[in-house]
């Protein structure tokens, strides 16, 4: 079964994320559990936790259908010790918030070397950061997102994801989220079913589908291999509809949150309905 949704706003209270997801007939959703552009957040209150859990229960969302995202400020591979410590503390807090909310996944961007350390050193720091966070939490899986490779961001090669996983001690609590826009911008073609087969055969060989814990379904304004992260609505960008239809018809993508981060929230309900329809329709757009 496919879990299909979008990254919805939690403005006004975390419970509102579940309500907004239900309003667009989503069977999955993503959210930030705190302001993603601030380091610190007030601790979760018992009321906030209870209201969130009640809303998820009311609208039939289990933790397997929810893919929270951490703050954009966090860099788990930071080359400077003090800044790395700050990121690690913030990441632990994000994991603990998920734990309190009964959530089992936390999606994050791996990190950046900032042109100050080698890729290898940065990847090792990211893995060590994950180990520290897993040691201080229970029940939450760290879900590494592939990146477009802008600037000094790592995670744009499947080999980067595999290297991080290799350095994580508890393999049962690490996974990956593949963003289609990021993959395309990083040089993994998805424009035809044949290219999708090739890209995900590479993924299966290098990382492994057992680690796939979520997807971000985004078309790309950016061009193929450009290393530029610019999302677009499904079928309106440089990837096109075929990739998303192909994903919907492949059971390797069952049972994980498939999350839209496309640019027009007003058509998320239509995009979700279209994706659901592709599971059975074999040809037409």
Swiss-Prot record:
Zn(2+) 1 binds at residues 69, 109, 145. Its cofactor is Zn(2+). InterPro entries: AP_endonuc_2, AP_endonuc_F2_Zn_BS, Xyl_isomerase-like_sf, Xyl_isomerase-like_TIM-brl. Keywords: DNA damage, DNA repair, Endonuclease, Hydrolase, Metal-binding, Nuclease, Zinc. Binds 3 Zn(2+) ions. SUPFAM superfamilies: Xylose isomerase-like (SSF51658). Zn(2+) 3 binds at residues 182, 229, 231. One of its GO terms (molecular function) is deoxyribonuclease IV (phage-T4-induced) activity. PROSITE patterns: AP_NUCLEASE_F2_1, AP_NUCLEASE_F2_2, AP_NUCLEASE_F2_3, AP_NUCLEASE_F2_4. SMART domains: AP2Ec. It catalyses: Endonucleolytic cleavage to 5'-phosphooligonucleotide end-products. Zn(2+) 2 binds at residues 145, 179, 216, 261. Signal peptide: none annotated. Its EC number is 3.1.21.2. One of its GO terms (biological process) is base-excision repair. HAMAP family: Nfo. Belongs to the AP endonuclease 2 family. Endonuclease IV plays a role in DNA repair. It cleaves phosphodiester bonds at apurinic or apyrimidinic (AP) sites, generating a 3'-hydroxyl group and a 5'-terminal sugar phosphate. NCBIfam families: nfo, PRK01060.1-4. This is Probable endonuclease 4. The lineage of its organism: Bacteria, Pseudomonadati, Pseudomonadota, Gammaproteobacteria, Enterobacterales.
